[in-house]
């Protein structure tokens, strides 16, 4: 069973762990943990700006970490992108993308991420939340 096929309750327990570990291993700058990591509160009750607090703080900017897998599609929720724009008013924002299927990573500025979102289709998760479906070819230039 692929990660995407597992029930959400199972996926949420490890969601982001692999990608965050890769960021910590591969970062060339000093960082500190910054964002919320599965806190024991109702996240849906929080405003998006708090819900999507970037994962790491560096002297160069805030870093949100997100992974993609076998389907080779980075799924960026619309409200997450808006929250990251809000954070960018305080400190530059970057997205560290880790592809666990091909063991590769990329660091995108918020400007680059926004451009790729505009070039991508909008789809929806089963619960109805819209997201930008960014194909890996828009990140790494592969076919």
Annotated model-derived regions:
Residues 1-45:
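Acidic-basic catalytic patches of nuclease active cores, encompassing PD-(D/E)XK
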Residues 24, 81-85:
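Short amphipathic alpha-helical segments and helix-helix/interface helices
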Residues 27, 54-70:
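Conserved catalytic cores of phosphodiester-cleaving nucleases, focusing on short active-site segments
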Residues 33, 62-64, 94-98:
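A structural signal for short, well-ordered beta-strand segments and their strand-loop junctions
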Residues 41-55:
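Charged, often glycine-rich, active-site loop that binds/positions anionic groups
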Residues 69-81:
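Active-site-adjacent loop/helix micro-motif of nuclease/hydrolase catalytic cores
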Residues 106-143:
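Intrinsically disordered, low-complexity terminal regions enriched in charged/polar residues
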